[in-house]
């Protein structure tokens, strides 16, 4: 939007360069390319994360994922997507949208970031949904409250057994032996 471009212009003018900018309602690959050009003209380098929040944007997710090398991830906007398709923001009605985002990110080596869990006080539900996101292929989950961060981090942190297994696989791979 015009307001978003103004915000970006002010950010670039004040020479404050964050590590990331999250772009809500990422419209298309062209949308990201415009932002990329503005950042480049300012002589800055920070990464972009696009949010996929509608059926139209989901339909273009592969081209959005390929828009610019500055893009490091795509985030799923579950609430807006649910509203767009007339569904509840539960896991099942949005599984296809999540799968498309995860696949597009995997194809391009991007972070796939799941939508936030909106019930701030329900840590059991947050843990369950975060583990589901992990098993679905997401590499991260957004948080809407600082109290959620430890639950999300715990779910995405590999266990000692998982680390040991990964090391064993790497050791065998270095030997040229399959497991």
Question: Could you describe each region identified by the protein language model?
Answer:
Residues 1-179:
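Expand to "…catalyze enediolate/carbanion chemistry for C-C bond making/breaking, isomerization
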């Amino acid at each position: 939007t015009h307001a978003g471009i103004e915000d970006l212009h002010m950010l670039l003018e004040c020479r404050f360069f964050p590590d990331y900018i999250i772009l809500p309602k990422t419209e298309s690959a062209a949308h990201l390319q415009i932002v990329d050009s503005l950042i480049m003209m300012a002589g800055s380098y920070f990464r972009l994360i696009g949010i996929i929040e509608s059926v139209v944007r989901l339909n273009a997710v592969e081209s959005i994922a390929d828009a610019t090398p500055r893009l490091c991830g795509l985030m799923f906007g579950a609430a807006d997507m649910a509203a767009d398709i007339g569904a509840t923001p539960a896991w099942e009605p949005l599984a296809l949208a999540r799968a498309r985002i995860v696949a597009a990110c995997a194809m391009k080596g991007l972070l796939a970031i799941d939508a936030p869990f909106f019930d701030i006080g329900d840590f059991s539900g947050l843990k369950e949904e975060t583990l589901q996101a992990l098993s679905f292929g997401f590499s991260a989950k957004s948080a809407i409250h600082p109290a959620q961060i430890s639950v999300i981090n715990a779910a995405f942190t590999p266990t000692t057994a998982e680390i040991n297994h990964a090391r064993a696989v790497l050791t065998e791979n270095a030997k040229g032996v399959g497991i």
